[in-house]
A protein has these predicted regions:
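Conserved phosphate/ATP/ADP-binding segment of small-molecule kinases
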Residues: 146-230
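Gly/Ala-rich phosphate-binding loop of Rossmann-like dinucleotide-binding domains
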Residues: 47, 153, 262
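Conserved phosphate-binding/catalytic region of the ribokinase-like
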Residues: 197-289
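Hydrophobic anchor at the start of a short beta-strand
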Residues: 2, 52-54, 78-79, 159, ...
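Short beta-strands and strand-loop turn motifs
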Residues: 101-103, 128-134, 162, 180-185
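Conserved N-terminal subdomain of the carbohydrate kinase-like
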Residues: 24-25, 48-128
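Charged helix-capping and loop-helix junction motifs
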Residues: 115-118, 142-149, 195-201, 236-239
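Glycine-rich phosphate/adenosyl-contacting loop at the front of the ribokinase-like
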Residues: 1-56, 64-66
Length: 289
C-alpha cells in the first residue's frame, strides 16, 4: 500500500483578477476552492493513475470536514486524525499580474495527537511506500520526519521525502528511496547559485552522497534531472505548453514517478511519467486529471 502524510493540509482558495490594488476593493474574475497540501496532491494524482493509496495527516473543524468530503467524492481513501481544536487552515492564492499567496498557520497538534500518527505509521508493512511531503507545523517538533523514518528503519519500506532545507537534509541519514527538491531549493540548501545542468547535477550528487538513494530535481520549464542509485543520470525535457498553474506540479511529478516505477521497475520510465504528470498539472487550472 502507498501512504501519504500531510501534516498541515489546507483549503486553497484560488482567485483570479486582472490586477491587485492594495487598500481598495478588488473584484475577482474567477474563484475556486480545492483541498490542498502536498501529500494530498500526491494522493490525488496516484489515484488518477490507478494506484489506490491512503492519505494520513491531521484535520480540524469545518474546513477539515470539507477536505474529507472532497476526497471521498473523488474515491480517495483517507485516514486523518481529527484534532479537537481550531480548524484546518485556509490558504489564499491570488493570481493577477503576479502570483501572491497568503497561507494560514493551522491548528495546534498535541503530543497525544502525534502519538496517534505514530501508531498508524507503526502499522506499515514491508513493501509499503510512504510519502512525506510538505512543511511541518510550527507547533510540532521539527524532527518529526526524522522520528518517523527512525521508527521504520528496520522495515523494508520505500520512503519518499519532498521537503525543504533542514527538513530534507536531516533525514538523509535514513537513506530515503527518493527525494525531490527543485533547483531553487537545492540552491538554498547549499547557499550557492546554480547556473547550469552540470552545477545542479554536482550538488544533487552531494545529496546522494549524504544518503539519498535517488535524487530527482525539478527545474520548471527546464525539465527534471534524476540521479539514480545505479549511478545513472537521466534528464527529461518539459513538453511545450502554456503554464496556467504552478501549484501541485512538483507533487504531480512525485506521484508520476512512483507510479512509473511501480509500472516498470525502471527509473528512466519513472522519470518520464513523473515529468509528464508535472507538466500536465502545470498546463491545467488545477491538478491534472
Amino acid at each position: 500500500m502507498i501512504y501519504t502524510v500531510t501534516l498541515n493540509p489546507s483549503i486553497d482558495y484560488v482567485i483570479e483578477l486582472d490586477s491587485l490594488n492594495h487598500g481598495s476593493v478588488n473584484r475577482v474574475n474567477e474563484e475556486n476552492i480545492y483541498p490542498g497540501g502536498k501529500g494530498i496532491n500526491v494522493s490525488n494524482i496516484l489515484n488518477e493513475l490507478g494506484y489506490k493509496n491512503i492519505a494520513l495527516g491531521f484535520i480540524s473543524g469545518f474546513t477539515g470536514k470539507y477536505i474529507v468530503d472532497s476526497m471521498i467524492a473523488k474515491n480517495l481513501n483517507c485516514d486523518f486524525i481529527e484534532l479537537s481544536n481550531g480548524f484546518t487552515r485556509i490558504n489564499v492564492k491570488i493570481k493577477s499580474n503576479e502570483e501572491t499567496e497568503v497561507n494560514g498557520n493551522g491548528p495546534n497538534i498535541s503530543e497525544e495527537d502525534l502519538q496517534k500518527l505514530y501508531d498508524k505509521i507503526d502499522n506499515l508493512k514491508n513493501g509499503d511506500i510512504l510519502v512525506l511531503a510538505g512543511s511541518i507545523p510550527s507547533t510540532v517538533d521539527d524532527k518529526l520526519y526524522e522520528n518517523i523514518m527512525k521508527r521504520l528503519e528496520d522495515k523494508n519500506i520505500k520512503i519518499v521525502v519532498d521537503a525543504t532545507k533542514n527538513l530534507l537534509l536531516n533525514v538523509l541519514k535514513y537513506n530515503p528511496f527518493l527525494i525531490k527538491p527543485n533547483n531553487h531549493e537545492l540552491e538554498e540548501m547549499f547557499n550557492v547559485k546554480l547556473n547550469s545542468i552540470e552545477d545542479i547535477s554536482r550538488y544533487a550528487k552531494k545529496l546522494q552522497d549524504m544518503g539519498a538513494r535517488n535524487v530527482l530535481i525539478s527545474m520548471g520549464k527546464d525539465g527534471a534531472l534524476l540521479l539514480t542509485e545505479n549511478n545513472e543520470v537521466f534528464l527529461s525535457n518539459t513538453p511545450k505548453g502554456t503554464v496556467k498553474n504552478s501549484v501541485g506540479a512538483g507533487d504531480s511529478m512525485v506521484a508520476g514517478f512512483i507510479a512509473g516505477y511501480l509500472n516498470t521497475n525502471k527509473y528512466e520510465e519513472a522519470l518520464k511519467l513523473g515529468a509528464a504528470c508535472g507538466s500536465a498539472t502545470a498546463f491545467s487550472n488545477d491538478l491534472a486529471t
